[in-house]
């Protein structure tokens, strides 16, 4: 099968246009079209090498075993779910915090998947109090116009008595004023709230000198998920991802390479199966 036939087969199978292939190999659409028609007058060897590399990459990606990050019900994850359930049932403010890559977000999303009464918001670095309220208004299908006090009142009116749970991920990115808005929503609407993020979230809630006592006093439970996975958690996730990890030596190697970090473990597992 010549290179043009192979290329057409890949394009038909995966739905690639000539334009997409041209961009992927760093050549113009015109040059790509001319080559396919057998009219290309440029460096044919270079063109065919680029196309061959493109075909190889597509096939490698197709043949690779796809390993997606997914929730695994480890002891720590179950503790996280218990904290979420407590915040939801008792309408309290709770916090999950720990280093990056330990599964906080997956635990939050798993709880949200199980219960459609959850409002899940992932904060971004540019979030302000107003941005947070506008995002919440959007989820509640409320008008986003008005000042912050108006938006708070709209959200409170919509949330009061609903028994919903507001989850804020990456909450360490929120400024103090946004954290105060969350406190007011909790106080006035009587809903449960869970904030999750890096360890500095606790500092942000307390204040560097403890000046935010009124804010942190609302926190009923704060679960420290640590700086690395417990070995029991790690081994369970490793075996769930890779049957080969039943071997203790393989688990030890994975643990050493990933430093007990779930996110690094997922990346290692993907690399193993490529």
State where each predicted segment sits.
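Conserved NTP-binding/hydrolysis module of P-loop NTPases
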Residues: 130-146
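Conserved small helical "lid"/interfacial subdomain of P-loop NTPases
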Residues: 224-250
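Conserved P-loop NTPase "ATPase switch" module shared by AAA+ and STAND
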Residues: 156-178, 182-188, 192-193
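A short, basic N-terminal segment
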Residues: 1-90, 274
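Conserved AAA+ ATPase "SRH/arginine-finger" region at the nucleotide-binding site
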Residues: 121-125, 204-209, 220-232
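Sensor-1/coupling segment of RecA-like P-loop NTPase cores
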Residues: 95-100, 185-212
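Walker A/P-loop nucleotide-binding motif
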Residues: 88-110, 124-125
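The conserved phosphate-sensing helix
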Residues: 257-273
């Amino acid at each position: 099968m010549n290179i043009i036939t192979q290329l057409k087969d890949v394009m038909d199978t995966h739905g690639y246009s000539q334009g997409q292939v041209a961009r992927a190999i760093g050549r113009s659409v015109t040059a790509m079209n001319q080559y396919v028609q057998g009219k290309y007058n440029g460096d044919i060897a270079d063109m065919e090498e680029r196309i061959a590399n493109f075909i190889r990459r597509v096939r490698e990606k197709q043949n690779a075993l796809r390993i997606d990050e997914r929730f695994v019900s480890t002891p720590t994850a179950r503790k996280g779910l218990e904290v979420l359930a407590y915040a939801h049932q008792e309408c309290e403010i709770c916090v999950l915090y720990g280093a990056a890559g330990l599964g906080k977000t997956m635990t939050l999303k798993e709880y949200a998947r199980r219960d459609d009464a959850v409002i899940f918001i992932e904060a971004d670095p540019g979030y302000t109090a107003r941005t947070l309220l506008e995002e919440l208004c959007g989820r509640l299908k409320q008008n986003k116009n008005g000042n912050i006090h108006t938006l708070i009142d709209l959200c409170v009116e919509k949330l009061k008595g609903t028994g919903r749970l507001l989850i804020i991920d990456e909450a360490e990115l929120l400024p103090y004023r946004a954290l105060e808005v969350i406190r007011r929503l909790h106080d006035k609407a009587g809903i449960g709230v869970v904030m999750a993020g890096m360890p500095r979230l606790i500092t942000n809630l307390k204040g560097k000198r403890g000046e935010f006592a009124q804010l942190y006093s609302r926190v009923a439970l704060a679960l420290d998920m640590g700086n690395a996975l417990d070995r029991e958690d790690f081994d369970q996730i490793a075996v769930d991802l890779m049957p080969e990890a039943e071997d203790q030596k393989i688990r030890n190697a994975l643990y050493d390479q990933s430093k007990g970090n779930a996110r690094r473990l997922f990346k290692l597992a993907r690399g193993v199966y490529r």
